[in-house]
């Protein structure tokens, strides 16, 4: 179980066995059933979660009442609400929900602080993870502005090749910022070509 998260985090820093043991000792394993809301809008996010198995979505509800998916998290990826900080008092602006039965390795802000004190090189790894997340978010924003819906769908398939087999089509449409009907037309055109 820890092999997955150790491999993922060691891509950024070559940790010693002792550092990884400290990291592993601060994580806890949690199984969550599908369709479980892990974070509600307005709540404080109290976890960083590594997906061992399963699929999760992060979304918000727009002014018209539509769900807008911001992120999918599948195996070997992290999910949290980084938009919320201890300096804000409004709480989270998003929901985090499991799509499938999901196995997670989780740590709280307190255990993350303990980790950074006991194994300071993890700060570099988390900084790199955050920078990568910001780059992905920026690229997605640029794609939404500059690319056609079909180009965005192609990019989505490259980034998340297994998601179309795991989630309803309307979730993918929401992520792409298009209607399910328009996504269906794109998929039909692709099948014909």
Regions flagged by a language model, labelled:
Residues 147-193:
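Phosphate-/nucleic-acid-contacting segments
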Residues 38-43:
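Short phosphate-coordinating micro-motif centered on Lys-Gly-acidic
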Residues 1-28, 84:
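Cyclic nucleotide-binding regulatory module and flanking cytosolic helices
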